[in-house]
Regions:
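Bacterial N-terminal signal peptides that target proteins for export
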Residues: 2-15
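Serine residues within intrinsically disordered or low-complexity segments
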Residues: 4, 24, 282-283
Protein backbone atom coordinates (compact mmCIF):
# COMPACT_ATOMS: atom_id res chain seq x y z
CA UNK A 1 0.00 0.00 0.00
CA UNK A 2 1.22 3.48 -0.83
CA UNK A 3 2.07 5.19 2.52
CA UNK A 4 1.41 8.65 1.10
CA UNK A 5 -2.05 7.62 -0.05
CA UNK A 6 -2.79 6.09 3.36
CA UNK A 7 -1.85 9.33 5.11
CA UNK A 8 -3.89 11.40 2.66
CA UNK A 9 -6.95 9.17 3.16
CA UNK A 10 -6.59 9.51 6.92
CA UNK A 11 -6.30 13.26 6.62
CA UNK A 12 -9.40 13.39 4.44
CA UNK A 13 -11.32 11.39 7.03
CA UNK A 14 -10.13 13.77 9.75
CA UNK A 15 -11.18 16.73 7.65
CA UNK A 16 -14.69 15.37 7.20
CA UNK A 17 -15.02 15.00 10.96
CA UNK A 18 -13.62 18.46 11.51
CA UNK A 19 -16.08 19.97 9.08
CA UNK A 20 -18.97 18.33 10.92
CA UNK A 21 -17.65 19.95 14.08
CA UNK A 22 -17.08 23.39 12.59
CA UNK A 23 -17.64 26.36 14.83
CA UNK A 24 -21.22 27.34 14.08
CA UNK A 25 -24.00 28.79 16.21
CA UNK A 26 -26.22 25.74 15.95
CA UNK A 27 -23.55 23.27 17.01
CA UNK A 28 -22.01 25.36 19.72
CA UNK A 29 -25.17 26.35 21.50
CA UNK A 30 -27.30 23.24 21.12
CA UNK A 31 -24.65 20.65 22.01
CA UNK A 32 -24.11 18.85 25.25
CA UNK A 33 -21.19 16.93 26.74
CA UNK A 34 -22.93 13.64 25.95
CA UNK A 35 -23.57 14.48 22.30
CA UNK A 36 -19.99 15.66 21.87
CA UNK A 37 -18.58 12.43 23.31
CA UNK A 38 -20.63 10.37 20.88
CA UNK A 39 -18.82 11.77 17.83
CA UNK A 40 -15.27 11.85 19.23
CA UNK A 41 -12.77 9.89 17.14
CA UNK A 42 -9.07 10.07 17.94
CA UNK A 43 -6.49 10.74 15.25
CA UNK A 44 -4.85 7.33 15.61
CA UNK A 45 -8.11 5.53 14.86
CA UNK A 46 -8.16 7.32 11.50
CA UNK A 47 -4.66 6.23 10.53
CA UNK A 48 -2.67 9.24 11.72
CA UNK A 49 0.36 8.04 13.72
CA UNK A 50 2.68 10.99 14.34
CA UNK A 51 6.31 10.02 14.80
CA UNK A 52 8.20 6.80 15.45
CA UNK A 53 7.49 5.87 19.08
CA UNK A 54 4.46 3.91 20.33
CA UNK A 55 1.85 5.38 22.69
CA UNK A 56 1.16 4.11 26.18
CA UNK A 57 -1.93 1.96 26.92
CA UNK A 58 -4.25 4.97 27.29
CA UNK A 59 -2.39 7.25 24.88
CA UNK A 60 -2.86 9.93 27.53
CA UNK A 61 -0.92 11.95 30.07
CA UNK A 62 -2.22 9.51 32.70
CA UNK A 63 0.04 6.81 31.23
CA UNK A 64 2.75 8.45 33.35
CA UNK A 65 2.47 6.58 36.68
CA UNK A 66 0.88 8.65 39.43
CA UNK A 67 -0.48 11.43 37.23
CA UNK A 68 -4.20 12.16 37.60
CA UNK A 69 -6.61 14.37 35.65
CA UNK A 70 -9.92 15.79 36.83
CA UNK A 71 -12.46 17.84 34.87
CA UNK A 72 -15.71 19.67 35.50
CA UNK A 73 -17.73 20.79 32.49
CA UNK A 74 -20.31 23.59 32.64
CA UNK A 75 -22.74 23.72 29.73
CA UNK A 76 -26.01 25.58 30.35
CA UNK A 77 -28.46 27.69 28.36
CA UNK A 78 -28.61 28.80 24.75
CA UNK A 79 -29.64 31.78 22.65
CA UNK A 80 -28.15 35.28 22.59
CA UNK A 81 -25.45 36.40 24.98
CA UNK A 82 -26.65 37.82 28.29
CA UNK A 83 -23.47 39.05 30.00
CA UNK A 84 -23.10 37.57 33.44
CA UNK A 85 -25.84 35.00 32.87
CA UNK A 86 -25.12 32.83 29.83
CA UNK A 87 -24.99 30.83 27.70
CA UNK A 88 -22.35 28.91 29.65
CA UNK A 89 -19.75 26.84 27.80
CA UNK A 90 -16.75 26.56 30.11
CA UNK A 91 -15.14 24.48 32.85
CA UNK A 92 -11.95 23.52 34.64
CA UNK A 93 -9.32 20.84 34.07
CA UNK A 94 -6.77 19.89 36.72
CA UNK A 95 -3.59 17.81 36.52
CA UNK A 96 -2.29 16.28 39.75
CA UNK A 97 1.39 15.32 39.31
CA UNK A 98 1.37 12.75 42.12
CA UNK A 99 -0.27 12.06 45.47
CA UNK A 100 0.97 14.34 48.27
CA UNK A 101 2.86 16.54 45.84
CA UNK A 102 3.19 19.19 48.58
CA UNK A 103 5.55 16.96 50.54
CA UNK A 104 6.90 15.04 47.52
CA UNK A 105 7.57 17.79 45.04
CA UNK A 106 8.27 17.11 41.36
CA UNK A 107 11.04 18.76 39.33
CA UNK A 108 9.51 21.16 36.81
CA UNK A 109 10.37 23.65 34.10
CA UNK A 110 8.43 25.95 31.79
CA UNK A 111 8.70 27.67 28.45
CA UNK A 112 6.70 30.58 27.05
CA UNK A 113 6.68 30.55 23.26
CA UNK A 114 4.49 33.66 23.04
CA UNK A 115 3.29 35.48 26.12
CA UNK A 116 -0.10 36.95 25.24
CA UNK A 117 -1.75 35.15 28.13
CA UNK A 118 -1.09 33.97 31.64
CA UNK A 119 0.05 30.96 33.60
CA UNK A 120 0.28 32.01 37.22
CA UNK A 121 2.98 30.68 39.51
CA UNK A 122 5.68 30.32 36.84
CA UNK A 123 8.10 32.63 38.65
CA UNK A 124 8.35 30.21 41.56
CA UNK A 125 8.65 27.21 39.22
CA UNK A 126 11.56 28.93 37.45
CA UNK A 127 13.21 29.94 40.73
CA UNK A 128 12.80 26.65 42.56
CA UNK A 129 12.91 24.15 39.72
CA UNK A 130 9.98 22.21 41.14
CA UNK A 131 6.19 22.01 41.31
CA UNK A 132 4.39 21.41 44.61
CA UNK A 133 0.66 21.57 43.84
CA UNK A 134 -1.83 20.65 41.09
CA UNK A 135 -2.02 22.51 37.78
CA UNK A 136 -5.38 24.04 36.81
CA UNK A 137 -6.64 25.12 33.38
CA UNK A 138 -9.64 27.40 32.80
CA UNK A 139 -10.77 30.52 30.93
CA UNK A 140 -9.15 33.93 31.19
CA UNK A 141 -11.53 35.75 33.51
CA UNK A 142 -11.91 32.74 35.80
CA UNK A 143 -8.22 32.59 36.78
CA UNK A 144 -8.66 34.25 40.22
CA UNK A 145 -11.65 32.09 41.13
CA UNK A 146 -9.91 28.90 40.05
CA UNK A 147 -6.77 29.90 41.96
CA UNK A 148 -8.98 30.41 45.01
CA UNK A 149 -10.39 26.91 44.53
CA UNK A 150 -6.92 25.37 44.33
CA UNK A 151 -5.89 27.24 47.48
CA UNK A 152 -9.01 26.09 49.35
CA UNK A 153 -8.38 22.49 48.32
CA UNK A 154 -4.73 22.69 49.39
CA UNK A 155 -5.71 24.23 52.76
CA UNK A 156 -8.11 21.35 53.29
CA UNK A 157 -5.35 18.84 52.53
CA UNK A 158 -2.63 20.71 54.45
CA UNK A 159 -4.13 22.84 57.26
CA UNK A 160 -0.73 24.20 58.28
CA UNK A 161 -0.29 26.20 55.07
CA UNK A 162 0.15 29.87 55.91
CA UNK A 163 0.37 29.17 59.66
CA UNK A 164 3.09 26.66 60.46
CA UNK A 165 3.99 25.93 56.85
CA UNK A 166 4.73 27.87 53.65
CA UNK A 167 2.10 29.64 51.61
CA UNK A 168 1.53 28.80 47.95
CA UNK A 169 1.13 30.47 44.56
CA UNK A 170 -1.12 28.21 42.43
CA UNK A 171 -0.36 27.39 38.81
CA UNK A 172 -3.44 28.36 36.80
CA UNK A 173 -3.28 28.62 33.01
CA UNK A 174 -5.90 30.33 30.88
CA UNK A 175 -7.31 30.55 27.38
CA UNK A 176 -10.06 32.91 26.22
CA UNK A 177 -13.32 31.03 25.59
CA UNK A 178 -15.39 34.21 25.22
CA UNK A 179 -16.42 33.46 21.67
CA UNK A 180 -18.59 30.54 22.79
CA UNK A 181 -19.05 31.29 26.49
CA UNK A 182 -20.39 34.06 28.69
CA UNK A 183 -16.90 34.75 29.98
CA UNK A 184 -17.99 37.76 32.06
CA UNK A 185 -20.09 35.43 34.19
CA UNK A 186 -17.00 33.68 35.56
CA UNK A 187 -19.13 30.61 36.06
CA UNK A 188 -16.44 28.24 37.35
CA UNK A 189 -16.77 28.22 41.13
CA UNK A 190 -14.49 27.23 43.97
CA UNK A 191 -16.71 24.18 44.43
CA UNK A 192 -16.17 23.15 40.80
CA UNK A 193 -12.40 23.32 41.21
CA UNK A 194 -12.43 21.31 44.43
CA UNK A 195 -14.69 18.73 42.81
CA UNK A 196 -12.33 18.37 39.84
CA UNK A 197 -9.43 17.83 42.24
CA UNK A 198 -11.34 15.38 44.42
CA UNK A 199 -12.44 13.36 41.38
CA UNK A 200 -9.10 13.39 39.55
CA UNK A 201 -8.17 9.90 38.38
CA UNK A 202 -5.42 8.05 36.57
CA UNK A 203 -7.72 6.49 33.97
CA UNK A 204 -8.73 7.58 30.45
CA UNK A 205 -8.97 11.33 29.88
CA UNK A 206 -12.04 12.83 28.21
CA UNK A 207 -11.15 15.10 25.28
CA UNK A 208 -12.64 17.90 23.24
CA UNK A 209 -15.44 20.00 24.69
CA UNK A 210 -14.85 19.07 28.31
CA UNK A 211 -13.47 20.87 31.33
CA UNK A 212 -11.39 23.91 30.45
CA UNK A 213 -11.75 23.02 26.77
CA UNK A 214 -15.54 23.33 26.65
CA UNK A 215 -15.57 26.74 24.96
CA UNK A 216 -12.27 26.60 23.05
CA UNK A 217 -11.71 26.94 19.30
CA UNK A 218 -8.61 25.70 17.50
CA UNK A 219 -7.71 26.33 13.85
CA UNK A 220 -11.25 27.55 13.21
CA UNK A 221 -12.76 24.27 14.41
CA UNK A 222 -14.08 23.22 17.80
CA UNK A 223 -11.00 22.70 19.96
CA UNK A 224 -10.39 22.00 23.62
CA UNK A 225 -8.70 19.25 25.60
CA UNK A 226 -6.45 16.71 23.89
CA UNK A 227 -3.93 14.24 25.21
CA UNK A 228 -1.42 11.65 24.00
CA UNK A 229 1.60 9.73 25.23
CA UNK A 230 4.72 7.91 24.12
CA UNK A 231 6.48 4.97 25.75
CA UNK A 232 10.14 4.65 24.87
CA UNK A 233 11.76 1.28 24.16
CA UNK A 234 13.80 -0.24 26.98
CA UNK A 235 16.94 0.54 25.00
CA UNK A 236 16.04 4.23 25.42
CA UNK A 237 15.19 3.91 29.10
CA UNK A 238 11.59 2.67 28.87
CA UNK A 239 10.32 6.06 30.01
CA UNK A 240 6.81 7.40 29.42
CA UNK A 241 6.08 10.91 28.19
CA UNK A 242 2.52 12.23 28.37
CA UNK A 243 1.05 15.49 27.11
CA UNK A 244 -2.24 17.28 27.76
CA UNK A 245 -3.23 20.40 25.83
CA UNK A 246 -5.99 22.97 25.96
CA UNK A 247 -6.10 24.01 22.32
CA UNK A 248 -7.59 27.42 21.54
CA UNK A 249 -5.07 28.59 18.94
CA UNK A 250 -4.47 28.99 15.23
CA UNK A 251 -6.43 29.95 12.15
CA UNK A 252 -7.99 27.45 9.78
CA UNK A 253 -5.59 27.97 6.83
CA UNK A 254 -2.71 26.98 9.14
CA UNK A 255 -4.04 23.56 10.17
CA UNK A 256 -1.70 20.76 9.10
CA UNK A 257 -2.26 17.02 9.57
CA UNK A 258 0.38 14.50 8.63
CA UNK A 259 2.17 17.20 6.68
CA UNK A 260 -0.95 17.95 4.61
CA UNK A 261 -2.30 21.55 4.72
CA UNK A 262 -5.84 20.49 5.59
CA UNK A 263 -6.92 23.97 6.60
CA UNK A 264 -6.14 25.36 3.16
CA UNK A 265 -7.97 22.53 1.40
CA UNK A 266 -11.22 22.74 3.30
CA UNK A 267 -12.09 26.40 3.37
CA UNK A 268 -11.96 29.32 5.75
CA UNK A 269 -13.68 29.49 9.11
CA UNK A 270 -17.18 30.97 9.19
CA UNK A 271 -17.25 34.75 9.33
CA UNK A 272 -19.95 37.20 10.24
CA UNK A 273 -20.41 38.20 6.62
CA UNK A 274 -20.97 34.56 5.59
CA UNK A 275 -23.86 34.03 8.03
CA UNK A 276 -27.47 34.88 7.57
CA UNK A 277 -29.00 37.82 9.50
CA UNK A 278 -30.93 35.35 11.64
CA UNK A 279 -27.75 33.54 12.60
CA UNK A 280 -26.03 36.81 13.41
CA UNK A 281 -28.81 37.98 15.68
CA UNK A 282 -29.33 34.73 17.59
CA UNK A 283 -25.89 33.50 18.51
CA UNK A 284 -23.25 34.13 21.09
CA UNK A 285 -20.75 33.24 18.35
CA UNK A 286 -21.84 36.22 16.27
CA UNK A 287 -21.69 38.63 19.17
CA UNK A 288 -17.90 38.41 19.28
CA UNK A 289 -17.12 37.67 15.62
CA UNK A 290 -15.86 41.18 15.04
CA UNK A 291 -13.45 40.94 17.97
CA UNK A 292 -12.19 37.64 19.31
CA UNK A 293 -13.59 35.72 16.36
CA UNK A 294 -10.47 36.82 14.57
CA UNK A 295 -8.22 36.68 17.64
CA UNK A 296 -5.01 34.71 17.67
CA UNK A 297 -6.05 32.34 20.45
CA UNK A 298 -3.83 30.42 22.86
CA UNK A 299 -2.68 26.94 23.81
CA UNK A 300 -1.59 25.42 27.09
CA UNK A 301 0.69 22.37 26.93
CA UNK A 302 1.38 20.28 30.05
CA UNK A 303 4.08 17.61 29.75
CA UNK A 304 4.59 14.80 32.26
CA UNK A 305 7.30 12.15 32.28
CA UNK A 306 8.76 9.55 34.60
CA UNK A 307 12.21 10.12 33.15
CA UNK A 308 14.43 11.47 35.96
CA UNK A 309 14.95 15.02 34.74
CA UNK A 310 15.79 18.26 36.53
CA UNK A 311 14.20 21.66 36.05
CA UNK A 312 16.71 22.73 33.40
CA UNK A 313 16.07 19.62 31.32
CA UNK A 314 12.31 19.98 31.72
CA UNK A 315 12.52 23.53 30.41
CA UNK A 316 14.22 22.04 27.37
CA UNK A 317 11.30 19.61 26.98
CA UNK A 318 8.92 22.57 27.04
CA UNK A 319 10.78 24.06 24.10
CA UNK A 320 10.42 20.80 22.18
CA UNK A 321 6.67 20.83 22.75
CA UNK A 322 6.64 24.03 20.70
CA UNK A 323 7.96 21.97 17.78
CA UNK A 324 5.01 19.60 18.11
CA UNK A 325 2.74 22.64 18.06
CA UNK A 326 4.43 23.84 14.88
CA UNK A 327 3.90 20.45 13.22
CA UNK A 328 0.15 21.06 13.37
CA UNK A 329 0.59 24.39 11.57
CA UNK A 330 0.89 26.97 14.34
CA UNK A 331 3.21 29.92 13.86
CA UNK A 332 2.70 31.30 17.39
CA UNK A 333 1.06 34.47 16.22
CA UNK A 334 1.57 37.87 17.87
CA UNK A 335 -1.64 37.67 19.92
CA UNK A 336 -1.33 34.01 20.90
CA UNK A 337 -0.53 32.82 24.42
CA UNK A 338 1.52 29.63 24.07
CA UNK A 339 2.60 28.24 27.45
CA UNK A 340 4.40 24.96 28.14
CA UNK A 341 4.91 23.41 31.57
CA UNK A 342 6.81 20.14 32.09
CA UNK A 343 7.31 18.05 35.22
CA UNK A 344 8.96 14.74 36.10
CA UNK A 345 7.74 12.11 38.53
CA UNK A 346 11.11 10.35 38.29
CA UNK A 347 12.45 12.07 41.39
CA UNK A 348 11.10 13.30 44.72
CA UNK A 349 12.16 16.67 46.11
CA UNK A 350 11.42 16.55 49.84
CA UNK A 351 9.58 19.24 51.75
CA UNK A 352 12.06 20.77 54.24
CA UNK A 353 14.37 17.74 54.49
CA UNK A 354 16.03 17.21 57.87
CA UNK A 355 19.36 16.41 56.23
CA UNK A 356 21.16 19.22 54.39
CA UNK A 357 21.61 17.07 51.28
CA UNK A 358 19.49 14.57 49.36
CA UNK A 359 20.07 12.44 46.27
CA UNK A 360 18.40 12.63 42.86
CA UNK A 361 18.74 10.30 39.89
CA UNK A 362 19.67 12.26 36.81
CA UNK A 363 19.31 11.32 33.14
CA UNK A 364 22.41 12.38 31.26
CA UNK A 365 21.87 15.08 28.66
CA UNK A 366 23.45 12.81 26.07
CA UNK A 367 20.48 10.44 26.52
CA UNK A 368 17.80 13.12 26.23
CA UNK A 369 17.16 12.89 22.48
CA UNK A 370 14.52 10.11 22.59
CA UNK A 371 12.65 11.94 25.37
CA UNK A 372 12.71 15.15 23.34
CA UNK A 373 11.48 13.37 20.21
CA UNK A 374 8.68 11.68 22.14
CA UNK A 375 7.61 15.06 23.53
CA UNK A 376 7.32 16.51 20.03
CA UNK A 377 5.30 13.51 18.83
CA UNK A 378 2.94 13.42 21.82
CA UNK A 379 2.30 17.16 21.61
CA UNK A 380 1.39 16.94 17.94
CA UNK A 381 -0.98 14.02 18.52
CA UNK A 382 -2.55 15.63 21.60
CA UNK A 383 -3.45 18.67 19.50
CA UNK A 384 -4.91 16.50 16.74
CA UNK A 385 -6.94 14.59 19.34
Amino acid sequence: MNPSRTILNAVRACAVILLTACVSPAWCLDGSPDSVDQVRIRARALGLHPGQFQPGPLNAITDVPGVKVGQVTLMQGDGPLQPGQGPVRTGVTVIVPRDDVWHKKVPAGSFVLNGTGEMTGLSWVAESGFLEYPIALTNTLNVPRVANGVISWMLKQYPGIGITDDTLTPVVAECDDGRLNDIQGRHVSETDVMRALDEASSGPVAEGSVGAGTGMISYGFKGGIGTASRRLPEANGGFTIGVLVNANHGRRPELTMGGVPVGQRYGAAPTQSSQSPDQNSSSLHASREGTSGNAEGSIIVVIATDAPLDGRQLTRLGKRAALGLARTGSTARHGSGDFMLAFSTGNVIPHYPSDPTFSLTHLADTHLNPVMTATVEATEEAILN
